Structures are given as structure tokens and as C-alpha cells.
């Protein structure tokens, strides 16, 4: 059955438009409460990033949950993976994160975790949607849910993250620039690296409700790259607005993406023979260099659709524990149930310390194929497969690549854009082909 409200990662949109308004969030909270409170008194954890609209959404969800008889624990600004961890740790029935991830402040959304810290199943999302479409009824007064602040949330998550780093190692001797994206990681990430011994230079760590992901964070690393060089740092770390993805920067100021980080982690595990990966899951956007490198090391590789939810689904089907996306969502089931930027960073820093090598050397294990990604804004829905102009452009693009590359056009699941990706052996041809396809998509939207 097709879902009416839920997208690929919860519910997301422009604040005040569509579903991201107080009225719908009130009803959503009530619907979630109805599903959870069918058989027992339930408790839900609510966290958020730093967007100004988080206050409104948090209050509306809280009221709806209470009206359904559900108790609420409020953590305030916390990374998405922290809510996944804490939901299971405190034995809550569900966790809710108010965030639009890497998007700017006018957007917001809501995503959910079950009691075990995993994203909700399709069946549970459909059950919630069914309740949304029913008339809202408030429980009697003595059954209303109570809300309380969870003041220990930051400390518990900080200690959990530190526990994933070997107790016989420290980060002493490392200078790290940490870009918090003016988002949910600002209050925890710098402390974690500092407490493990690193010299920390924190940037984009002063959120004001409007500056989340604004010329900072995992999707815009230019300032971080400059700061790593300026401070003569060993490494730079960039999170996105909700802290579930990671991009790093080596000491030369060069960006290291999710494919490269995933490759470093997989090969490290393979040689350690400790929790050696049976295989690694990437996505249809993962660089061919990742696939080829892993296969040279006899590590199986499979591709899922884009989205950490789909990565995790395929990991679970295969019985593998490591997977991720080029964008920096990396899931390591040895430690957590969802992408966690801090824990991924700690694993890379561990490898650096144990190998006594800089990130610039570690990333040499993978040779990336030239790849160009262009996001083309659209209005409404564009049927890529049936559009004659786009079909003609794809045919021409395939001729240009001459069988030595990949072409992918797909609508984003989180933004009104068509993503055009071209990959091949010749960077000039790849860029020319991508620009030609992007122009065809743009022309088709006029």
C-alpha cells in the first residue's frame, strides 16, 4: 500500500506549507500515541536539531502524544543517532527526531525510531497514517501523558560514544577542527573528542535557529578545509545538521567523502580479522572505485537505492554489519543502529592512531573514478523515464562514455531536485556529459 504522508525518511517539508505545521504535528503526535498506547502505557523520547521551528513542532507533538495517553521525555537538541541510542537505552517505546538533516532552516521534518533504535517498518508507518485520518479524541484526564526533561541525555550519549573507542588509546597529539554545522552535534561532539585527549578547534558551533547548515557542515566543507590548513590541524570533521553523516578533511585541506571513509573502515576490519566484514553495502551513487577496491581485497559489495534506510535494509538481508553512502551516512552495526557521524569519526581516528598514519595516506587505498553530481531544481513531478528530451540526452550521453562509465538520473527523496550523476574514466568527458544531461533536465522543466 502506498504511503500518504511518510517519505523515504519520515515526514519532511517547508515549515508552514504542506504537512510541517502545528495542526498536522498535533495530529501526528496523537496518531503515534494511539498506535503505541493500544496495549500499555507508553513513553516516547523526543529530540531535535537547532532549527527555530523545532520549538513549535516539539510542543505540538508533545500535546498530541499526551492527548493519546503517552508519556514524553524531552532531550532538547541532540544528534539523530543519539535519540536512536537513548530510545533503546532508556527502554522507551519509540524515539522521535525533529530535523530536516542537511537542509536549511526553512525546512523541517520528523523521523522515528522503534524501541530497538531502528527506523520504523513500513507496516508501522501505515498504521500511524491510518490513525492520522481518524477524528482526534483526547483520553480522560487521569490517563493524559506527562512530559519531563531528560537532563542526563547529553552525558549519557557522550559516554556511549567514548565507549566505542579503545580504552588503551587516546587522541593525544591530534589537532582536530570540528564543524558542527550549527546543528544538533554542537553540544556534544567537541566534548567527546576533547575528553579523549584531542586539541579541538570547534567551528559552526553557535546555532541561532537560522544558521544550521549555512555555509558549513558536511554539505559545504569549504570553510572547514580552510580552517584545517590555517590551524595546521591533523584532520577536519564535518557533521550535518542532525549529526548522522560525516565528511572529513585531511591535513592538506582535501575533502574525504563517505565512500573513502567506508573503504578505510572495511579494509581495516578485514586486515584486523576482528569482526571481518562478509561484505559492504553501498548505494547506486557509490563511486566505482569503492567497489573495485573492496573486490581486490576479496570483500563483497552490493548496492542499494539511495537512503540510509535502504542501506540498512540490505545489510540486514545480507547479514552484513557495514554500509554507507557517499554523502557520509555510514552504518556500523557493531556499534549502533543508524548512521552516526561521531562514532564513524572515532573509528577513523582510531585507525589513524593505530596505524600511525595521517588520513591523507589512509585514503590512498581507494582510487576514485571521476564522478560529477549535479542537482537540477524542478517544480512538480518530472517523469524522467518517459520524457523524450531526457531519453534522447541519455542516449547521446551513453555514446560519449562509450561503455566506460555510469549514468544515473533520479529524483531526490528529500528535495525538489533531479540528481544527475555521471561517472567514467575521463574527467573531462564525465563533466561534459553531466552538464549536457543537466541542461536537458532543466530544459524539460520549463
UniProtKB/Swiss-Prot annotation:
GO molecular function: magnesium ion binding; phosphoglucosamine mutase activity; phosphomannomutase activity
Active site positions: 101
EC number: 5.4.2.10
GO BP term, example: UDP-N-acetylglucosamine biosynthetic process
Catalytic activity: alpha-D-glucosamine 1-phosphate = D-glucosamine 6-phosphate
UniProt-listed InterPro entries: A-D-PHexomutase_a/b/a-I, A-D-PHexomutase_a/b/a-I/II/III, A-D-PHexomutase_a/b/a-II, A-D-PHexomutase_a/b/a-III, A-D-PHexomutase_C, A-D-PHexomutase_C_sf, Alpha-D-phosphohexomutase_SF, GlmM_bact
Task performed by this protein: Catalyzes the conversion of glucosamine-6-phosphate to glucosamine-1-phosphate.
NCBIfam families named among the record's database cross-references: glmM (TIGR01455), PRK10887.1 (NF008139)
HAMAP family: GlmM_B
Record protein name field: Phosphoglucosamine mutase
Species assigned in the record: Coxiella burnetii (strain RSA 493 / Nine Mile phase I)
Source taxonomy: Bacteria, Pseudomonadati, Pseudomonadota, Gammaproteobacteria, Legionellales
